[in-house]
Amino acid sequence: MKIAIDAMGGDHAPKAVVLGAMKAIKEYSDLHITLVGKEEEIRQYLTSEERITILHTDEKIESTDEPVRAVRRKKQASMVLAAQQVKDGVADACISAGSTGALMAAGLFVVGRMEGIERPALSPTMPTVDGEGFVMLDVGANVDAKPIHLYQYAVMGSVYAEKVRGIKNPRVGLLNVGTEDGKGNELSKQVFTMLKDAPINFVGNVESRDLLQGVADVVVCDGFTGNVALKSLEGTALALFSMLKEQLMSSFTSKLAAAVLKPKLMVLKDKMDYSEYGGAALFGLKAPVIKAHGSSNDQSIFSAIRQTREMVAKEVIPTISSVMEKEPLQ
């Protein structure tokens, strides 16, 4: 199995990418990795070249670049070359912690869209209080959506949750303003009706306040709603941890309490740590394309590689394609 990685994408590249790649190579004997980027910088952190190849390029896509224009003009950028490796059949999948918009453009224009899928979806795995997490899609690939798009998101998310996350008969929920049937705008109502007849375990409408409780294994929404929900959850979690830290450090007594509670607090922190959940998959493309978090450390990169390997090994893309062929809904 071969995975191409944009070694120059992310806040801590290439160090985090190289260290994460070496960790993955040690863990998985069937894995070969191509690191795409500036060879001189990559070699500063590469202590073992076992099953690791470097594809040198001086060009990269910056966070300030306009995504589509950058992908079309910077043909030798590390992200574009990683995607090209997939298109050419040299790699089975690609990963980048660089610009989300640019990676979506590279996925569409270079890797290509899966036949029958109208719009790709960006899908991270979000944490829950029980540590199991849930898949949410779309969180920003498309801010506007039609009912058919959300129907396809539900099917793709269900296949992923079962194949990669090992959840038998995953629960699929539609993010809405209430749990009752008939709630929401016209889009939500149409999608609800369609999902009731879909080849998935549809559990109905779910509310954002229940997401972290694990009310569903897959949560479906349009990209605008998903992005707002995602950032609200992230912001709330950061604010709560900040307030908790402030209170625990406010007096000598509370500091003693903090020392006693530290092991439990670390468990809680680990449950909410994005670095353990891998990256956000771009569903609807011809091959796995994974967007790692922009601030990924080496553990985050390793988790994204593990996730990508599972997608390839469990044949997620062919399975989605097969299911969609059996359920042509236009």
Swiss-Prot record:
Function: Catalyzes the reversible formation of acyl-phosphate (acyl-PO(4)) from acyl-[acyl-carrier-protein] (acyl-ACP). This enzyme utilizes acyl-ACP as fatty acyl donor, but not acyl-CoA.
Designated gene of the protein: plsX
Catalysed reactions, semicolon-separated: a fatty acyl-[ACP] + phosphate = an acyl phosphate + holo-[ACP]
Class of enzymatic activity (EC top level): transferase
Molecular function GO labels: phosphate:acyl-[acyl carrier protein] acyltransferase activity
Its EC number(s): 2.3.1.274
Record pathway: Lipid metabolism; phospholipid metabolism
Gene Ontology cellular component terms for the protein in this record: cytoplasm
PANTHER family registered for this protein in UniProt: FATTY ACID/PHOSPHOLIPID SYNTHESIS PROTEIN PLSX, PHOSPHATE ACYLTRANSFERASE
Name of the protein in its database record: Phosphate acyltransferase
Highest taxon of the lineage: Bacteria
Entries under Pfam families matching the protein: FA_synthesis (PF02504)
Entry's Gene Ontology BP terms: fatty acid biosynthetic process; phospholipid biosynthetic process
Alphabetical UniProt keywords: Cytoplasm, Lipid biosynthesis, Lipid metabolism, Phospholipid biosynthesis, Phospholipid metabolism, Transferase
Source organism: Bacillus cereus (strain AH820)
Gene3D superfamilies with a match to the protein in the record: Isopropylmalate Dehydrogenase
Annotated HAMAP family: PlsX
UniProt subunit comment: Homodimer. Probably interacts with PlsY.
Sequence similarity: Belongs to the PlsX family.
InterPro entries xrefs: FA_synthesis, Phospholipid_synth_PlsX-like
NCBIfam families linked: plsX (TIGR00182)
Record localization: Cytoplasm
